[in-house]
């Protein structure tokens, strides 16, 4: 079983981007920025990736806290590279969140190398995350009952600590500063004949787009996986989860077997679990890490495999007999441990400083009172917003890059985090002859590796990854997308006996 499959079985990062569109002009003139930043000093040392299995090189690189003041203090950003003989350039990978780091790609290193066989890989940690100077608030962790249970005093303590110990770094943890870090790093390490491809996922596409605004001619090509334009509308993000989740339950109601388990009204079945006055199935709560059934449902909805099994998960969660606990904990054990430690402080800083204002708490409470699917990030930002330090508005926000570089935009039609409607709206601004939007049916977030064409434990290259591979081979040619016809379709709410046995430990996902 490859790390790539495990990463696709993994529950998606708790922090993913939700987006909204704001029509605008192209923003400030790229001007001197695109001419290239001054070179940086980089000293590489031996390290490893993918849990020690892959040799790599790492560097802590000092960059200006504020690129507008190159003589001022510095902050450290962390970059890891995986090189191979006879490559022709570099593939830079930008993680999502905001708050995730380059480590999020390491569980799929083998698969990424397969689709970018002639490129060295560079994993850059955004300011405030991973191995970069980390914005840390140890007390700001998800409450067991969900972000709705967050004590505002914890946010106040976090702000006090950050403004006391990391005030300059906090102010400079912004998308535009991170984009300038990327441009300077590429300018420093790029060889005279290297081609450079930059790929971002989720919030990483927002970061990548800001980079394109600043350096519209620097990269050879770019890939945007799960397109995130005007990110951070966290109430709309949760509404999208609820809408798509309810649509799935409607499919259950129309399926004879599923309806025989959850009843004629599956929404009522889930509502009873969400509203339960007593904890639901404590052993599963411990394995999942939350007691909120609504949050569990929201997280599972994002997973390319777990979404097929969501009705069976709810059915067994409600019954909670020993056989159910065994099956559910087996399913949850298929998650991988290769993801980075997400910086909640960086999530809040970038969300509130660069993406969108916090939603009004009254609107959040009104929506969440009836929601069945939600990760409650709307609660997190609504609670934190009133006490988080105000930021200077960024003039690049709401505008679009003017670039002709080859661009692959790829998005799942069933993505609850970065919706297909938002991807289409974003793509309308990039209509060059080598700029393509590819829509993947039956696919959720993380479309490149979340578009399986076979059920586990089989592990062929996913459709999105194959399309990206073809694009990297020939960015000037529209990639063949015929594999979209082969993207996995479940049999009702199962992926078949072999997958059921592997994921659940039984071929009877309802009763076994």
Stretches with model-predicted labels:
Residues 317, 322-355:
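Long, low-complexity segments enriched in small/aliphatic residues
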Residues 266, 310, 324-328:
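Short amphipathic alpha-helical segments that mediate assembly, nucleic-acid/protein binding
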Residues 36-293, 349-512:
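Gly/Pro-rich cap/lid or specificity-loop segments adjacent to the active site
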Residues 1, 5, 9, 13-37:
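Ser/Thr-rich, Pro/Gly/Ala-heavy low-complexity intrinsically disordered linkers and tails
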Residues 278-296, 301-306, 337-345:
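Structural motif
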Residues 304-305, 320-323, 475:
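Short helix-adjacent coil turns
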Residues 301-315, 357-362:
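Short helix-capping/linker segments at secondary-structure and domain boundaries
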């Amino acid at each position: 079983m490859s790390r790539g499959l495990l990463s696709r079985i993994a529950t998606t990062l708790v922090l993913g981007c939700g987006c909204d569109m704001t029509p605008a002009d192209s923003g400030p003139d790229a001007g001197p920025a695109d001419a290239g930043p001054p070179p940086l000093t980089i000293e590489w040392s031996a390290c490893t990736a993918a849990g020690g299995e892959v040799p790599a090189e790492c560097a802590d690189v000092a960059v200006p806290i504020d690129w507008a003041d190159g003589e001022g203090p510095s902050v450290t950003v962390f970059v890891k590279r995986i090189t191979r003989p006879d490559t022709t350039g570099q593939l830079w990978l930008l993680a999502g969140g905001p708050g995730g780091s380059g480590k999020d790609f390491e569980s799929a290193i083998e698969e990424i190398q397969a689709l970018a066989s002639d490129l060295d890989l560079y994993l850059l940690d955004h300011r405030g995350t991973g191995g970069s100077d980390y914005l840390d608030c140890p007390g700001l962790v998800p409450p067991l009952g969900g972000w709705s249970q967050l004590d505002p005093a914890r946010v106040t303590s976090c702000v006090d600590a950050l403004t006391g110990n990391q005030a300059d770094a906090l102010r400079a943890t912004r998308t535009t500063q991170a984009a300038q870090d990327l441009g300077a790093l590429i300018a420093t390490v790029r060889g005279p004949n290297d081609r450079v491809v930059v790929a971002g996922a989720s919030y990483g596409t927002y970061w990548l787009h800001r980079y394109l605004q600043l350096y519209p001619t620097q990269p050879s090509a770019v890939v945007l996986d799960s397109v995130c334009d005007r990110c951070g509308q966290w109430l709309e993000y949760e509404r999208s989860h609820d809408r798509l989740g309810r649509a799935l339950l409607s499919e259950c109601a129309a399926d004879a077997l599923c309806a025989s388990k959850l009843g004629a009204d599956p929404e009522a079945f889930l509502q009873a679990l969400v509203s339960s006055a007593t904890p639901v199935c404590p052993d599963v709560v411990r394995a999942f890490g939350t007691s909120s059934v609504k949050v569990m449902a929201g997280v599972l909805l994002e997973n390319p495999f777990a979404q097929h099994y969501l009705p069976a998960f709810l059915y067994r969660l409600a019954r909670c007999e020993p056989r159910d606990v065994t099956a559910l904990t087996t399913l949850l054990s298929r998650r991988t441990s290769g993801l980075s430690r997400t910086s909640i402080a960086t999530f809040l800083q970038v969300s509130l400083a660069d993406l969108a204002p916090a939603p009004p708490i009254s609107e959040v409470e009104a929506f969440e009172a009836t929601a069945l699917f939600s990760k409650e990030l709307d609660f997190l930002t609504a609670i934190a917003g009133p006490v988080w330090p105000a930021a200077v508005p960024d003039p690049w926000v709401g505008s679009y890059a003017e670039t002709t570089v080859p661009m692959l935009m790829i998005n799942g039609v069933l993505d609850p985090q970065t919706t297909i409607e938002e991807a289409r709206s974003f793509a309308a601004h990039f209509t060059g002859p080598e700029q393509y939007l590819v829509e993947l049916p039956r696919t959720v977030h993380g479309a490149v590796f979340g578009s399986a064409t076979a059920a586990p434990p089989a592990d062929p290259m996913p459709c999105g990854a194959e399309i990206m591979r073809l694009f990297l081979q020939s960015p000037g040619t529209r990639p063949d997308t015929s594999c979209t016809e082969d993207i996995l379709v479940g049999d009702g709410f199962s992926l078949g006996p072999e997958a059921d046995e592997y994921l659940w430990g039984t071929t009877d996902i309802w009763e076994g």
